[in-house]
Design a protein with these regions (language model features):
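Bacterial N-terminal signal peptides
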Residues: 5-17
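Aromatic- and Gly/Pro-enriched helix-to-coil junctions and flexible linker segments
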Residues: 17-205
Length: 205
């Protein structure tokens, strides 16, 4: 029997905070941008940004990112009165020309998160809200995948300082260290391609 050896690796970025009952800028909005690659070094996270729009690399400076999104460019990136008209949504949804292509389909959960945050008035998290203290990777199967169905589904749970736990699978960025051996989809589905060892990294802000 041909077996595909998999090892779950993950990276966690802490200091996230959460606002109960509202979309969290730090724990939801910024992870959406990271998940889509918007603040990567090859995109708006580069030192010079892209197209006059610069974000901190992998959201390391939440306050600066909030200012860039809501204040810079004459506040044109955000339209609180009609969120659908915000450049932050129109560009990645391909409603307007976007060099990065389609990133946020209008029917996606990520689009709705950004829309609701804008609709709420673009709040930034209160320093008093609970911090993210860790994440846990859960899987519906073993870390050794066997043919003829070499697949597994990952679920990512975040823990907060107040004891709360939340499923953040839809907010994390997955990547495989060797896609010739295994691939990982945005929903956490890992699929073996051929025999070997590959690491899966999970990034959550």
């Amino acid at each position: 029997m041909l077996a595909l050896l998999m090892r779950w690796f993950f990276t966690i970025f802490l200091t996230g905070i959460i606002v109960e009952g509202a979309v969290s800028f730090r724990n939801e909005v910024l992870p959406v941008l990271t998940r889509q690659g918007c603040n990567a070094g090859t995109c708006h996270g580069s030192p010079s940004g892209k197209g006059g729009f610069a974000l901190s690399l992998f959201a390391f400076d939440a306050a600066a990112d909030h200012r860039v999104l809501t204040k810079d460019f004459l506040s044109r990136r955000i339209d609180v009165l009609d969120p659908h008209l915000s450049l932050l949504l129109r560009k990645p949804s391909n409603d307007l020309s976007h060099r990065g292509g389609l990133k946020l389909p209008k029917d996606s959960r990520e689009y709705r998160i950004l829309h609701d945050w804008i609709s709420d008035g673009c709040p930034i998290d209160s320093p008093a809200t609970p911090a993210c203290v860790g994440i846990e990777i859960q899987t519906n199967g073993p870390s050794v995948l066997h043919w003829p169905q070499p697949t597994a589904k990952l679920r990512i749970m975040a823990s907060f300082a107040d004891g709360a736990k939340r499923d953040v699978t839809h907010l994390v960025q997955f990547s495989s260290s060797d896609e010739a051996i295994a691939t990982v989809q945005p929903n956490g589905t890992v699929k073996g391609v051929r025999r070997g060892l590959s690491a899966v990294m999970v990034r959550y802000l």
